[in-house]
Amino acid sequence: MEWTTERRYRLYQDWTQEEIQNIKENMAQSPWHTHYHVEPKTGLLNDPNGFSYFDGKWIVFYQNFPFGAAHGLKSWVQLESDDLVHFTETGVKVLPDTPLDSHGAYSGSAMQFGDNLFLFYTGNVRDENWIRHPYQIGALMDKDGKITKIDKILIDQPADSTDHFRDPQIFNFKGQYYAIVGGQDLEKKGFVRLYKAIDNDYTNWQAVGDLDFANDRTAYMMECPNLVFVGEQPVLLYCPQGLDKDVLDYDNIYPNMYKIGTSFDPENAKMVDVSQLQNMDYGFEAYATQAFNAPDGRALSVSWLGLPDIAYPSDRFDHQGTFSLVKELTIKDGKLYQYPVAAIKELRASEEPFSNRAQTNNTYELELNLEANSQSEIVFLADKEGKGLSINFDLVNGQVTVDRSQAGEQYAQEFGTTRSCLIDKQATTANIFIDKSVFEIFINKGEKVFSGRVFPHADQNGILIKSGKPTGIYYELDHGRKTN
């Protein structure tokens, strides 16, 4: 089926019940549904939005096009959780149904004000000449989940920006509310702009200036900027589209990166003593990471395990995209560590010593120990011939390599089928989460992370130790959710 512009932007109410039922039936045939990762009820899931804590629950929304695996007319679907591991979908909350968001409810953030959750997002509007008008707008969600949209533009497109201006993130710094928005200037260079809420009024914003984070100005657009505080240190997470690979090498179509500062100077829109740019994730898919500071001060994050402008094998079943596990962010020795929240251990249903396994249910966690100066290769999602997802731990040369070239149906091969990162040549741990069509690998409790999708064949469900003598524990995971 061809996704024409007309079809992508067809009004929600114009889709028939028969068409929707056909989409659901097709999606049910997919062999790649996840068990403990969030996936869309139908269609496409992309950016996490509005990650927050409200009315005693963790809240996050996913951007959704419910009518197929395509980027079309977007809405926000709400999820809520008591533990950041089990999420319940409570329905579509932000629809593209006003003149300020008629062509899509794009990405944004959330913050509690009184008895309401303030949703701050980009309304995507196209005029009769199909020219885009990005409006930073808002809505209030009460404790019953009712949405009331704020009927005015909160931040308009600046005169010095193209129509690529989006993804507002609201945050609190020392009792004052601020927001950052990603954009592209008239020279087609990416920037992040800082705003201040006048009298802490979330409907009244004043520009402070472009955030100074030692921007190298090689990216043409800054998507999904998030400023979060890890301890006292500001950490800027962002997606610099088009970043020059001489600045920092990466393999994916678009990168997701971060910088750490020693302090934040909002009056001068400055991150002080900014670190070198670093990759957030060394795998094949991790994008649009959203983070916020929880009421207890922890910095929590979640990512879209998918990428723009990539076709996936699951597309033919009318679904695409999952979320990563929710991770807690910490800083150790100047490095950002990302590791799943402690409640993930509650999924462990059984444990056994790690060994070769002819067959698994492809929903498990491995906790591995690798000795210094050792070399090991393990194949996950392995078939009888030993083909699958290969992970090579080379602690002689200090490198980890992930190879998905023999793991099921291939896609996005023009961006390579291997990913690697450097690690210290010393004893190393790895926590590896496999979930049907998702893998997440955490080296040394989150010092380095690899995330990605794989679409294994039906007979790819074993574990093979191809070389070396890694030891550890195999945990079968049970989320309680039915998958096919």
Predicted features, each with a name:
Residues 1-103, 107, 111-167, 172-218, ...:
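Beta-rich carbohydrate-recognition and catalytic domains
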Residues 3, 18-20, 254-484:
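Beta-rich accessory regions
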